[in-house]
Amino acid sequence: MERNPFFGNNILTYSMQLPQAYIKVKEIDTLLGKVILFTNPARTLLYAEASGYISLGLLNQDLTFVSDFDRSQTQPWTYLVNTAQVRFAHPLNPFYLNQLKNNNHLKQYIVYIPSPVLRFINRAFGTLIPIDQMLKSEQELQTILNQHALLKD
């Protein structure tokens, strides 16, 4: 892990290696937050690395891209979100995330949440947020990324 100057010297940044097969398809930046989206060659996984403050505007742009991605699909796909670098999220985000249910080809929504407290909070919103699987460890995240990296068109 390396130090992140934006958050001061006491906060360490997440430095997991994304498998080479992944292709960056979109970067959404706001003043305080960012979402970078990648897909595997077979387009069966859309992977999002979120960081900073996840505002309603940032989330709305992300969900618009996810919806466009879904419309371009003819096969089932998985949406995997890494929240390790999220510092704060707007309290209404769970209501917006409920829109994920409207994607016809989305078969699974997986979220990596390293914090036990945040996993508990997300479980409390279980009826609002359609999370199919919550990952606790970086190893679980890396395993899913590696499995999907091996898939070909």
For each predicted feature, which ranges?
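Amphipathic, Lys/Arg-enriched alpha-helical "gate/interface" segment within cytosolic domains
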Residues: 2-153
